[in-house]
């Protein structure tokens, strides 16, 4: 396993680690201790910083593809997923939920944005040959920045269902644009999204189905706090955090 060999080498040679979330820092500290022992692990530094986002908020140049605009052309709710197609992103979980909703007569749409990753042949085949492909299920594998911005600004909610993440940047990108977010109940998502996100149980598809059904009915954000109150650091603050993390190891 390439990653396992790389990580084993890093653990033996690094003096410290700067991670992109507090959650990852804590998980990494535990993993390192498991490999080299608690005493050696405590000699290393562990810090974290958060990614910024405001550079994404720019004026759209008008280059939005017509096919993308068509997805949002009617009143049906559009739920957006952003991320490479790979097992960790857990697209199949969301597809299972929407298959049940569509069988029950839902007119809501699911729009996937992300390129082909790895170990996703079955998922790609499922999407391409889905009964609702092009009518209720849409996939854009090569969307440019303008297109992604358009999708964020016109969707009804972002869904993020990953089994594991280091940060969860789509949460920040969505909330920056006032888009409600529904996310799997992971520690890192709660770290980033806090009370601005509605969480669902990744072991129980019924919990996501209930959120989507409620949103379809009421068109109201289900999180305790609305996106309008969302504030996040900019890239200058992010860079300052990284410098502090790299120089002090105590962030």
Task: Please name every model-derived segment.
Residues 1-251:
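Carbohydrate transferase catalytic cores enriched for Leloir-type hexosyltransferases
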């Amino acid at each position: 396993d390439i990653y396992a060999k790389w990580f084993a080498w890093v653990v033996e040679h690094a003096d410290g680690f700067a991670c992109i979330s507090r959650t990852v820092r804590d998980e990494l500290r535990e993993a390192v201790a498991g490999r080299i022992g608690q005493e050696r692990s405590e000699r290393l530094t562990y810090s974290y910083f958060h990614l910024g986002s405001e550079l994404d908020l720019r004026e759209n140049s008008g280059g939005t593809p017509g096919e993308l605009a068509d997805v949002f052309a009617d009143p049906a709710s559009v739920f957006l997923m952003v991320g490479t197609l790979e097992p960790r992103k857990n697209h199949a979980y969301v597809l299972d939920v929407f298959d049940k909703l569509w069988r029950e007569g839902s007119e809501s749409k699911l729009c996937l944005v992300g390129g082909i990753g790895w170990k996703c042949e079955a998922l790609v085949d499922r999407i391409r040959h889905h009964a609702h492909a092009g009518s209720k299920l849409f996939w854009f594998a090569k969307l440019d920045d303008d297109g992604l911005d358009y999708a964020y600004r016109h969707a009804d909610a972002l869904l993020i269902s990953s089994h594991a993440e280091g940060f969860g940047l789509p949460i920040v990108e969505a909330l920056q644009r006032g888009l409600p977010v529904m996310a799997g109940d992971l520690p890192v998502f709660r770290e980033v999204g806090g009370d601005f996100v509605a969480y669902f149980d990744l072991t129980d598809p019924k919990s996501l189905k209930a959120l989507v059904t409620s949103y379809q009915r009421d068109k109201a954000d289900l999180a305790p706090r609305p996106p309008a109150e969302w504030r996040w650091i900019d890239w200058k603050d992010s860079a300052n955090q990284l410098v502090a993390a790299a120089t002090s190891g105590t962030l």
